[in-house]
């Protein structure tokens, strides 16, 4: 009797559990709007996009949503020509998807792998004709697999040469890559560091082994095959496509100002494409359908699967790289978003796919506020239509005992290490700070520990995995969904705080030299011999350092866009002064010895004050040397 009752009770319990699970699934389904309903999608997209475009001054944008091989929603926002009020047409209007162009380069590489002309695991130097990658790490050559996963070990770079706005500066791809070959700062296969140069190199390799210039190759083997009539890597655009191009605009108070078409031809395979939203759906349809859109095939199904299965990841608990494609964190478990984002100085774009949902989202927004619209829209769309449950996590009570091991500043391996732009590394570090509530502040967001060296955003699903060495010391971190952005733990002298203190202290010291010269002008003129020479050394140090900071400040005042297009002449001129300042620092150091030995100055404090000038001068000399400001090491 009791056994029967117990069995019935157990059966009822199991039914209740099953019923609860069904209700939970239904509730989740009900909570997610129907992404196959065009009216529902349009209402959401309009609500986010229109407001943000107006608020952030984005003159044009486009969104396309595809599911099950069918375009559910596509719509243009704003105007491709503001003056003529020409509206955006998602079928024909071209946008600049930036690094989404790389996916066409990776498909081209894998086509040549299919044809037996390329091997992912051999030294790429055997595919190069006019130059070779430097043998920085003997016995460790760079391979196409390294290039596809951004683990080639190259430093990053781009100021003054990656994107230009003058077609007269276009040079052949091989010449451009030879001229701008980056330093190999790491052995291949160890660290991820996004590389436009390496991607462009992959495009050159495709051209070399196929015997067809890269732009023509993509046109013949992808665009023509898929019927992508409104897509091109050619710069400037052919006239028949240029009339459909969303113009590039800046924004001054109350009006848009047209700017030149961005030229990326010198590194074209990394980002030179222009394409319409509907043409991007054709590309997506092939990727979601085993490499073919109907009878139009660009890859074998097994090759596409290889792209998705093989790649690189630093920590299996966070998403890393497929072969060229980024694995994204959007959507619930099983959604497995992959694709790429892309940005030029004018356009910000997203291209996301899910095989499980047979789904694609493409968006692109232009203008100075395009990035703000992009940031507000993309994640919000996935969270709306493909929500991910966010559970409340209580921070471990004992986390405070180990929180300090994570504290510090972390710099990206996607940085420059040999040229003037390396200084950006010191200004863009990711700061990690333990908080009293047993959480970590990583950048602007709070995270809670969920596993050993693994943290989840408190009010979101973003994850960060820290890395440690054999001794258990934290050495770096990787962010879920950003597989090409590995960070290393920065030494104190590579942080913004230290840099600010060093430069600020030196400026105060140099200001003191000028003030002292002003109120002791008569005493200065009365000085004789070595003592006057010592004072002149202080003037030389203060003047050369101050002039560098003044001219460099003017040189960068035009903003990052101007620096991307070309290094301004005034910034080039400013680089004379670090050389003079370093020589003056050495001179001042020698004179400081003389100052003490000869007993110059009215008191011991005067001699200490003079030594402080030497200290500031030598500190700035180190600053110039370490951050590659001593000389004219830039590409133009």
Outline where the language-model segments fall.
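Short, well-ordered beta-strand elements
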Residues: 350-367, 475-479
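Catalytic tyrosine of NAD(P)H-dependent dehydrogenase/reductases that use a Tyr as the general acid/base
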Residues: 95-98, 192-194
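Bacterial N-terminal signal peptides
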Residues: 13-24
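Active-site SXXK
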Residues: 46-49, 63, 69, 96-124, ...
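Peripheral terminal and inter-domain segments
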Residues: 30-32, 372-636
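Short, surface-exposed loop or secondary-structure junction motifs
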Residues: 71, 77-81, 136-355, 368, ...
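Short, conserved catalytic-motif segment at the N-terminal edge
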Residues: 35-95, 117-119, 126, 134, ...
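N-terminal secretory signal peptides that target proteins for export/translocation
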Residues: 1-11
């Amino acid at each position: 009797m009791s056994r029967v009752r117990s069995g019935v009770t157990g059966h009822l319990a199991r039914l209740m559990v099953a019923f609860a699970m069904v209700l939970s699934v239904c509730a989740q389904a009900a909570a997610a709007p129907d992404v196959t309903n065009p009216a529902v999608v349009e209402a959401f997209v309009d609500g986010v996009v229109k407001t943000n475009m107006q608020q952030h001054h984005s003159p044009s944008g486009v969104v396309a949503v595809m599911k099950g091989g069918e375009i559910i929603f596509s719509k243009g926002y704003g105007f491709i020509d503001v003056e003529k009020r020409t509206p955006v047409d998602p079928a024909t209007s071209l946008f600049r998807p930036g690094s989404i162009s790389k996916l066409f380069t990776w498909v081209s590489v894998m086509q040549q792998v299919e044809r037996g002309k390329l091997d992912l695991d051999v030294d790429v130097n055997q595919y190069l004709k006019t130059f070779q990658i430097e043998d920085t790490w003997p016995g460790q050559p760079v391979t196409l697999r390294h290039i596809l996963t951004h683990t080639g070990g190259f430093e990053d770079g781009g100021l003054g040469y990656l994107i230009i706005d003058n077609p007269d500066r276009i040079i052949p791809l091989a010449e451009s890559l030879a001229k701008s070959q980056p330093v190999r700062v790491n052995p291949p296969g160890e660290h991820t560091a996004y590389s436009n140069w390496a991607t462009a190199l992959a495009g050159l390799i495709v051209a070399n082994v196929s015997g067809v210039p890269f732009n023509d190759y993509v046109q013949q083997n992808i665009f023509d095959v898929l019927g992508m009539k409104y897509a091109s890597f050619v710069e400037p655009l052919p006239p028949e496509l240029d009339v459909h191009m969303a113009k590039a605009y800046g924004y001054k108070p109350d009006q848009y100002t047209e700017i030149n078409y961005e030229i990326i031809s010198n590194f074209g395979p990394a980002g030179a494409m222009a394409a319409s939203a509907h043409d991007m759906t054709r590309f997506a349809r092939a990727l979601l359908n085993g490499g073919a859109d109907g009878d139009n095939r660009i890859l074998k199904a097994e090759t596409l699967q290889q792209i998705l299965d093989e790649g690189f990841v630093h920590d299996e608990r966070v998403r890393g790289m497929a072969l060229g494609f980024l694995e994204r964190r959007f959507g619930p478990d099983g959604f497995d978003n992959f694709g790429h984002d892309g940005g030029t100085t004018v356009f910000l774009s997203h291209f996301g796919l899910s095989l499980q949902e047979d789904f694609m989202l493409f968006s692109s927004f232009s203008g100075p506020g395009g990035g703000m619209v992009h940031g507000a829209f993309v994640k919000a769309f996935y969270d709306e239509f493909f929500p991910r449950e966010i559970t409340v996590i209580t921070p471990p009570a004992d986390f405070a005992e180990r929180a300090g091991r994570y504290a510090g500043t972390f710099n990206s391996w996607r940085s420059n290490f040999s040229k003037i732009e390396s200084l950006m590394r010191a200004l863009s570090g990711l700061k990690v700070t333990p908080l009293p509530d047993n959480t970590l502040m990583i950048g602007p967001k709070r995270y809670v520990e969920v596993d050993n060296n693994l943290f989840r955003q408190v009010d979101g699903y973003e994850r960060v995995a820290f890395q440690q060495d054999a001794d258990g010391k934290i050495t770096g971190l990787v962010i879920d969904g950003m597989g090409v952005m590995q960070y290393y733990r920065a030494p104190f002298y590579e942080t913004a705080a230290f840099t600010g203190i060093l430069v600020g202290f030196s400026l105060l010291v140099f200001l003191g030299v000028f003030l002292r010269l002003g109120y002791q002008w008569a005493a200065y003129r009365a000085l004789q011999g070595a003592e006057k020479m010592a004072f002149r050394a202080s003037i030389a140090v203060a003047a050369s350092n101050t002039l560098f900071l003044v001219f460099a400040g003017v040189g960068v005042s035009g903003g990052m866009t101007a620096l991307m297009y070309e290094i301004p002449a005034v910034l080039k001129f400013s680089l004379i002064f670090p050389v003079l300042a370093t020589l003056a620092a050495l001179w001042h150091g020698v004179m400081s010895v003389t100052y003490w030995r000869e007993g110059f100055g009215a008191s011991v404090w005067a001699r200490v004050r003079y030594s402080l000038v030497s200290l500031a001068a030598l500190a700035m000399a180190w600053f110039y040397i370490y951050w590659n400001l001593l000389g004219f090491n830039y590409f133009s």
